[in-house]
């Protein structure tokens, strides 16, 4: 029996594709029924349902749903009833199955026929065509719907592209007229500083674009205004076209246009222009006339006065305009005045707020001025003042009158021009100040140099007293007196020269006139008095100058010598401390002398400069006199000078003051005029001679000093030679000791193994300093008890001082003190089997420097016991028992006292030799070591004694080594404690 629910049927009628989806029970997507039987026309394809914006959802009508539900409900009821009947028949007729089997088959066959009939009806060709038509219609509608969406998207893309292009056009650097008009409106509304508000008002430009547009706009206005003014001035003509606006006459006194710059304005009442150059030039001329008579410092004050005058003039003119601002005559026809202020000046209108409000009437408030500044910058493109003020009144200041606004404009213009004039005057004043300050600084520097002369001489006195040089003290005292006298003389000479210049000016026709003669006589008398009083002082100064110059030359040589002496003294300090101290004292004296000479040099330079200045003044006087005098007077002057020169030469030769010939009346006048010059020449000659004498004396003194220094150098060289000889002698003794010990020591290492032979120059190389046991970093611990057997004398420590005792090896050498580590001192006769290996790091494989006489030799020269790879020691040739006789390498207890005394002697010797840097412990220890030699001689033969073999650490040799090492101050236990 086939299930009727497995089939999905479509009712006849119109199919609604736009309704809500049907429940999922009736959709083949959400159900999986069993496969239906094959109909007669084959299976129908399951077409997907294309719905608008609801993917795979079934659309259905409410009426159609009710019909389908009713039809399916009837089928379900029929099927349920039929099944129920079949079950009842099967239950009641089980026993009668065979009888009713045919009836059931017939009934079943009838049902199949009914079903086939129903299928034939449902799947008729007409139904299939209608279904296909519906689907085609649905697909066409779907296609049209998709086309509409595509067209909508394309239109949106086109709009987006158009908007992009329009935005690009908006962002272009070229502003449209509408944008510019909005910009002007925003500028008048918000001002030029509120860029954000302007950009929002324009609505197509960002703030940066607004800012750049405003800058270009204002700059264009300034350029156009400048061109207009230039063209206007060129039309008016005249050479002074830049100053035309300053020379123009104004209107009536009360009108606000009295400050106008219009050239065609009528002149009702001529008022002086406060900005004209005539007033400024006249004031400058007056001040300059004053400054010519005064010093350089007065120029600065005069320039400042100019500025003050300008300010007062401007202020007075502004106050008059304020008082009479209301008396303007409206009947006068005047031409519209051009706007002369620039946009940059209008933008800075708030800077002139206080200056303008001070001129304007009291009815103006700061807020009114702010509105005025906004209107000024927003309407700066206006060409004439009347239209500018009219726009300001209409848009910004409706409560103020046109006259007040025009007066505010002129006040602002006046403040701008006043600031410009102040800036120009400041620039000029700065230039003048720089020149005047330079002159004053030069004068002050010269005065400071003179003051330094006095200070330097006082310092020289102190230094010379420390050195106890009487000659230098006398010279310095003279320098003090002479410096003071020079200053006075220079001042007097300068005053005299100034008087001569004024009197001998171009106004005086002749030198023989009455007034110049009287003045010259007074001047000559003053000069005679001053020169007579100060001749000696000037001579002393010149002499001192010459002496100091010689000192400069000689002291340079002395400095070189001192530098060489210092180097030699440093070398001597290493060897002899006493000699180096003496040399240092000498060097200190020389250094003090050099300091004094340097101070004298400063004085010489300054004094010479003063003398040159005086000479220059005299030359200037001569030039003035020559310009004012005739040729005859010049010739007479030359004759008089020649006579005076001859007389001075005679005085110098004979040292007798001759009588002067009586001059003529004309020559008397000339002599009275030029007598100061003659006296100056005489003083110069006397000073020159004295300078030469002092130079000779100083040269002699310097030669003596050089000789003394040479003697000191020779003494130092002799001391160095003596020290070198002593060092050579000590080295010879040391080498002799080494050579004498080489015969008694162990076999040469070089004969056993040639690879370890050192170069002959090995001893000459620089080595680290010896380890001094007496130093505080190596504390010597006292022995608690009697030390163990230690090698009192060993052939390895054999350093004879040229004395061999029968060749037994028991020579006078330094004993083993107990403070030395004996690890490497146990000899091994089988050295050929165990050569010294410097590459192995063992306690004795590196170079160790021992105190005492062994400080110049390395431990490579001695036999040593080296550990090989474990605790295996060098095998010796005897049994581990005690030796049959005592070894010469170890002393008895009786020798320990000698060892302690040797330690003390070594310490004392090291301390004493620390000053010279040379250890001479060989000589000092020789006397202490005689006891050791006697003890060693009693031990038997001095030849090598063969030890017993120490194959284990418990051997006798190892025990002796350990006990000896434990008693030393360099042991591990003592170092840790």
UniProtKB/Swiss-Prot annotation:
One of its GO terms (molecular function) is DNA binding. It is found in: Nucleus. One of its GO terms (cellular component) is nucleus. Residues 195-218 bind DNA. Residues 254-275, 505-516, 783-797, 944-960 have a biased composition (Polar residues). Signal peptide: none annotated. Residues 1-122, 229-331, 422-516, 531-650, 738-853, 872-960 are annotated as: Disordered. Residues 21-39 have a biased composition (Pro residues). Residues 241-252 have a biased composition (Acidic residues). Coiled coil: none annotated. CDD domains: SANT. The keyword Transport does not apply. InterPro entries: Homeodomain-like_sf (IPR009057), Myb_dom (IPR017930), SANT/Myb (IPR001005), SANT_dom (IPR017884). Residues 167-222 form the HTH myb-type domain. Residues 75-118, 276-329, 422-504, 738-754, 798-848, 887-943 have a biased composition (Low complexity). Residues 52-68 have a biased composition (Basic and acidic residues). Keywords: DNA-binding, Nucleus, Transcription, Transcription regulation. The keyword Cell division does not apply. This is Myb-like protein I.
